[in-house]
């Protein structure tokens, strides 16, 4: 009989995509996968596209919800735990994988009450509150970066397989270095929601550098027309709302400018690319710490949001346009931090705890 895994992950791509990579690894080994999520977040639409059945509980964050939501919180959580209990009793998984998001809290409690072993994976350099608590009841704790937990196995972030199949950066960049002079290909990612500071600053840089660069700018949902208008039909820019084929985009790029979400950092390492990171400013400095994973080995440059001006960015880019060897060195350093077997290792741990 096939073994069963229940995945608890939701809210953002940083939680969902690594979990999908693990699911696919286990499906190849004959496992059945079911997903626990919420109806109003991205997993509701995304997960079924991978032919993975999904069950829903009602839970959301409390931030910004007001006093009434705080008063109702214990009852909301209890209701979500009971919903998760019913799903676990119906599905009877051999193990539960917690990958983060609000759904993981009630799901983790329900799994513990049903004596189902929990494997926890923290994607960020600093653990979220839900995972800090779940780590106390998990059978095994895994992490992408070595700083999240003092006692956990560091395995990296599972990333899409096609990134690991790209040519080694030394080969990729060598071919470009021997070609005729060409513009510096810059991949700009504002994230799925769009990063306003990036979307505002890059058009100024594109205008200043002209044909010395070519920009592919992923502007984020709802920003396509606005950003396109800002560029004013510049012939060194291509603007899209989303990028469907990330492997192709990374393969095209000489440099990436983006936020430093955990999955993005690990994808850039897997592809072997230099990066300029603009960490989202949050009180726990989560994205800044994610970025240091590559910056500390010389593979990336961190520019804090208040310093992300056109003038400062020009001062960084102009030397790189002239010194392509520097970009090659950064790309190779990034690739040394890749963890191509992360999904495989998470799958191995799940198999171990299910025995």
Curated annotation (Swiss-Prot):
Its EC number is 2.4.1.227. It holds the Pfam family Glyco_transf_28. It comes from Haemophilus ducreyi (strain 35000HP / ATCC 700724). It is a peripheral membrane protein. Belongs to the glycosyltransferase 28 family. MurG subfamily. Keywords: Cell cycle, Cell division, Cell inner membrane, Cell membrane, Cell shape, Cell wall biogenesis/degradation, Glycosyltransferase, Membrane, Peptidoglycan synthesis, Transferase. GO terms for biological process: carbohydrate metabolic process; cell division; cell wall organization; lipid glycosylation; peptidoglycan biosynthetic process; regulation of cell shape. It catalyses: di-trans,octa-cis-undecaprenyl diphospho-N-acetyl-alpha-D-muramoyl-L-alanyl-D-glutamyl-meso-2,6-diaminopimeloyl-D-alanyl-D-alanine + UDP-N-acetyl-alpha-D-glucosamine = di-trans,octa-cis-undecaprenyl diphospho-[N-acetyl-alpha-D-glucosaminyl-(1->4)]-N-acetyl-alpha-D-muramoyl-L-alanyl-D-glutamyl-meso-2,6-diaminopimeloyl-D-alanyl-D-alanine + UDP + H(+). InterPro entries: GlcNAc_MurG, Glyco_trans_28_C, GlycoTrans_28_N. It is found in: Cell inner membrane. GO terms for cellular component: plasma membrane. NCBIfam families: murG. Pathway: Cell wall biogenesis; peptidoglycan biosynthesis. Cell wall formation. Catalyzes the transfer of a GlcNAc subunit on undecaprenyl-pyrophosphoryl-MurNAc-pentapeptide (lipid intermediate I) to form undecaprenyl-pyrophosphoryl-MurNAc-(pentapeptide)GlcNAc (lipid intermediate II). Gene3D superfamilies: Glycogen Phosphorylase B. GO terms for molecular function: UDP-N-acetyl-D-glucosamine:N-acetylmuramoyl-L-alanyl-D-glutamyl-meso-2,6-diaminopimelyl-D-alanyl-D-alanine-diphosphoundecaprenol 4-beta-N-acetylglucosaminlytransferase activity; undecaprenyldiphospho-muramoylpentapeptide beta-N-acetylglucosaminyltransferase activity. This is UDP-N-acetylglucosamine--N-acetylmuramyl-(pentapeptide) pyrophosphoryl-undecaprenol N-acetylglucosamine transferase. UDP-N-acetyl-alpha-D-glucosamine binds at residues 12-14, 124, 160, 192, 243, 262-267, 287. It comes from the Bacteria.
């Amino acid at each position: 009989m096939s073994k069963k895994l229940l995945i608890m992950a939701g809210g953002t791509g940083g939680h969902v995509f690594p979990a999908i990579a693990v699911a696919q690894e286990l499906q190849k080994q004959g496992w059945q996968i079911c997903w626990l999520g919420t109806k109003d977040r991205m997993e509701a639409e995304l997960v079924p596209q991978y032919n993975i059945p999904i069950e829903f509980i009602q839970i959301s964050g409390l931030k910004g919800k007001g006093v009434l939501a705080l008063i109702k919180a214990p009852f909301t959580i209890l209701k979500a735990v009971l919903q998760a209990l019913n799903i676990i009793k119906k599905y009877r998984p051999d193990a539960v994988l917690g990958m983060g998001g609000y759904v993981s809290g009630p799901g983790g409690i329900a799994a513990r009450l049903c004596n189902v072993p929990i494997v926890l994976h923290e994607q960020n350099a600093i653990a979220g509150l839900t995972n800090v608590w779940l780590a106390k009841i998990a059978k095994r704790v895994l992490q992408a970066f070595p700083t999240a937990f003092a006692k956990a196995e560091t395995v990296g972030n599972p990333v899409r397989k096609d990134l690991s199949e790209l040519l080694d950066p030394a080969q990729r960049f060598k071919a470009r270095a021997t070609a005729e002079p060409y513009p510096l290909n810059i991949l700009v990612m504002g994230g799925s929601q769009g990063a306003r500071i990036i979307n505002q600053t890059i058009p100024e840089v594109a205008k200043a550098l002209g044909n010395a660069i070519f920009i592919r700018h992923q502007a984020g949902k709802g920003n396509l027309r606005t950003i396109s208008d800002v560029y004013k039909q510049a012939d060194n820019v291509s603007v899209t709302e989303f990028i469907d084929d990330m492997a192709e985009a990374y393969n095209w790029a000489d440099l990436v400018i983006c936020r430093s979400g955990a999955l993005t950092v690990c994808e850039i390492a897997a592809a072997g690319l230099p990066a300029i990171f603009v960490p989202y400013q949050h009180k726990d400095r989560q994205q800044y710490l994610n970025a240091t994973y590559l910056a500390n080995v010389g593979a990336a440059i961190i520019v804090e949001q208040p310093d992300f001006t056109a003038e400062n960015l020009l001062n960084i880019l102009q030397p790189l346009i002239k010194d392509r060897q520097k970009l090659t060195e950064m790309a190779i350093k990034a690739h040394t931090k890749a963890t191509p077997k992360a999904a495989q290792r998470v799958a191995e741990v799940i198999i171990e705890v299910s025995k």
